[in-house]
Amino acid sequence: PIRSSAASDVYKRQVVFGAADTFRAAAIDQLQVWAAKVKADIIKSEINSDPASVAFKTAEFAKKNEIDVALIDTAGRLQNKKNLMEEYKKIINVLKKIDESFPNEVILVLDATTGQNALNQVKEFSKIHNLTGLIITKLDSTAKGGVVLAICKKYNLPIVAIGMGEKEDDLQPF
């Protein structure tokens, strides 16, 4: 299987992570662990700092250093949380200040146990910026992920990866 470190090991691409989930200290710590595992740079800030600032610094670092892939991890958000959706909009806007073509991809991570609410999530996220793909997680649980087919068809979105656990090798290309 292709591991999460595929970008740096297999494809010989440079990767930088942006720890833009600044609300949970554990999120920053987890991303640091993953960055070390996959030999990626990481841009981070203090807890409760502005997530859009971290996203900006990450994209700026990637562009300046000719990094192939910048992955910006944001706080988990539901489409009915207005302040988090506004933050998502702000992140998109600050990325465009660096380069109008940014972000090149926006991949929404959906929990397979979410059910029909996933349709609403995709709809609301798509209003802010076009999504380019989905990652479906928790397919190792009892979830069947049936709504995913409806989402893919309605929004013409590919599934780029599926999560079958929490280990390094459990995120599989699809």
Regions found by a protein language model. Give the residues of each.
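Glycine- and other small-residue-rich loops at beta-strand/loop junctions that grip anionic moieties
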Residues: 20, 47, 110-111, 140
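Active-site/ligand-binding-proximal alpha/beta "capping" segment
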Residues: 91-93, 118-135
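P-loop NTPase motor core
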Residues: 82-86, 108-117, 123-124
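Residues immediately C-terminal
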Residues: 77, 115, 141
